[in-house]
Structures are given as structure tokens and as C-alpha cells.
Amino acid sequence: MKIAIFSQDINQDVENVLQSILVHEEASNCNFFIHDNLRQCEINANNFSLFENHENLNESFDLFISIGGDGTFLRSIEFVRNLNLPIIGINTGRLGFLATTKKENLEKSLTKILKKKFSVEKRSLLKVFTENNCIPMDSFPYALNEISVVRKDTTSMINVKTSLDGTYVNSYWSDGLIVSTPTGSTGYSLSCGGPVISPTSNSIVLTPISPHNLNARPLVISDSTKIEISVSGREDFHLLSIDAKIYTVKNETKIYVEKSDFDIQVANINNYNFYKTLKDKLLWGKDKRN
């Protein structure tokens, strides 16, 4: 079994998890490739090689392990891209909607992971591009959670003109607009009043950020919809975020968002269930009146 391992943070929890993986009783059947930034960890093992970027990975790999929180998991897709390589997240962070494998149950979980006893679920991505190529050519313009436009260098509202499949729909006077995948519906969009959507739904959510007009509500659309956005306001520029990546874009620039032509494979163990995760993470059903 050929496995790539990544973490964007170096701390004791990450080092402990990494060490546990490399010395696990099933590790002798695996070839491990750890990301270059993990070489600074104190590892008492030598059964691994290093990788630096997505060009070092290929279809011969069986699994990509992300050690950290959901932010680390989002970074992982930049390495995996369109390889159809399952990603499993071992959670050393906080909430963990994507990194669902708990470090407290690590030994049992690793036995299943290293024996390939996991299920795989497809998650859709969003692709973004702009006129005038505002996004660097060497970047990865895809989002597993959301793409958003927000104001920059001003406390004034911006106007986000939005068209769907070539039809003008609305101009959101607001702090910005979130375009979210079903996976991202439990993230930034949810904090701004958006709905929770099952991650395998064929949907996209448009969620305005603090809209001036209270009738500007979140909108759920088909993921086959082509979205066009342009921003105007008192300042000359606004911010475009693609998951954790942020770019400065000139106002009036047309931004296009659509579903990606490839999916991300999310691996889970222990009979993962999205609705159980909702209950655990959002404390649904915990009210004493229930």
C-alpha cells in the first residue's frame, strides 16, 4: 500500500500521530511518503520517503492521510487534485467535519486504514476563473468548501451583481457573497445563515454575507448552474477567496464559478454517517427537553 502523509502544522499531536502511523504493526506492508515539511519532526522510523508537491504524486498511490483539522484537509486537495486518490483526515484540530478520524481511537483506526478497510464518498468541487486572469496561472483554482467575494479596505457595503446561466438574478448589497459546495455548507456559509446540505447533494448554495436587504436570502441551485459575479463599491478592489487562498481583484472584473469536472474522494472509517456527524458536532438532539 502506497500512502502519502501531510500536515501543515508541526506540533506534538502531529508528531505523535505520524510516529504511530510509521511504527504501526501494519506499516511493514506500506510504502510511506511524507511531505517535506514533516522532515523536522522527531521520527523514530526510517521507512519513509519525502514528497514536495502534487507533481511527486501519481495514480500509483492508494491513500492520502491528512493530519490536522479541516483546514489541513482543504490544503490536501491541492496535492491530490484529479488523481482520484482517497483522502482520510486524522483530526488533531477542533471541529472536524472533514477530518473525522479521532486521535483518541488512533490505534484501532490505523489498523482499518492500513488494511484499506474504509469507505469512499465523492465530494464535488467548485472551479473559479476570471476575465483578465486575476488568479495566478500556477495556482489551484478549485474549492472543496467555498468561493467568496468580500469587501477590502472599507467598512462600506459592496454590490455583488450575480447572474445564473446568463440570467441576471440579484445585486447583493452586503459585505460579500459566498458560493458554497454541499461540503462547505457546514462552514462559512452556515455561519452566515446558509442551510446545511447533505454532502452528496448535487447543489450549490449562494449565501449573502450580512445583506442590507433582509429579503436577500440564501439560494440553493443545481450544481450544473454557471455563475457569473461582478463587484462594485467605493473602493477599487475586493477580495476573492478560494477556500484558504485569497486574491485581490479589481472591481467590475467578471468572476465565473462552476462545478469542477472532477471530484475529491473522501475516505471514512467506522461506518461514517453525515447525520450522526451533524448531531455530534452541532450538538443536535442534546437539548434536555429531548
Q: Where are these predicted regions, by residue range?
A:
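Short glycine/serine/threonine-rich phosphate/pyrophosphate-binding segments
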Residues: 14-15, 72-76, 186-191
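N-terminal glycine-rich "phosphate-gripper" loop used for MgATP/nucleotide binding
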Residues: 66-70, 77-79
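Short glycine-rich anion-binding loops that position phosphate/pyrophosphate groups of nucleotides
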Residues: 10, 70-72, 95, 183-185
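Catalytic core of DAGKc-family lipid kinases
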Residues: 94-175
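ATP/nucleoside-binding phosphotransfer catalytic cores, i.e., glycine-rich phosphate-binding loops
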Residues: 149, 154, 165-168, 216-290
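Gly/Ser/Thr-rich active-site loops/lids in small-molecule metabolic enzymes
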Residues: 170-174, 179-215
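ATP/NTP phosphate-donor binding region
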Residues: 1-63, 67, 104-119, 129-141
